[in-house]
Amino acid sequence: MANKKYEIRYLPTFISQFNNILYYITYELKNKIAADNFYNEVVKQIEIISNAPESYEVYKTIKDEKIKYYKINVKNYTIFYVVKDNIMEIRRIYYSARNFDNLI
């Protein structure tokens, strides 16, 4: 049986956070090549997981969430997403060393 491809939806919060990270790498660290590589890697990994997003790690939050969050790591960052029907909703991206419990 073929894997079902999920529609990818990026929430504005994720887009804003991702743009801030890319800006930081490009202008603060002065490394446009690293920013481009990071952008490409994030997009690639999201495309890959969209084939089977529910097979990735579930994030166990301390909050009583009714929504099941999944997470993937790309370089030093963690991306959080949820799955609703045939939609994979990309919600947040954080530096992996952060404590996520109060953020998700």
Q: Model features per residue range: what roles?
A:
Residues 25, 32, 36, 53-60, ...:
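Secondary-structure transition/capping residues
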Residues 3, 57, 95-98:
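Residue-level signal for pocket-adjacent positions within structured domains
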Residues 1-41:
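Arg/Lys-rich, positively charged N-terminal/basic patches that mediate binding to nucleic acids
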Residues 47-73:
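A short, surface-exposed loop/turn module that caps and links secondary-structure elements
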Residues 11-13, 52, 93:
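Generic beta-structure capping elements
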Residues 29, 67-70, 74-78, 82-104:
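Enriched for short, Lys/Arg-rich terminal
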Residues 41-47:
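Compact soluble domain cores
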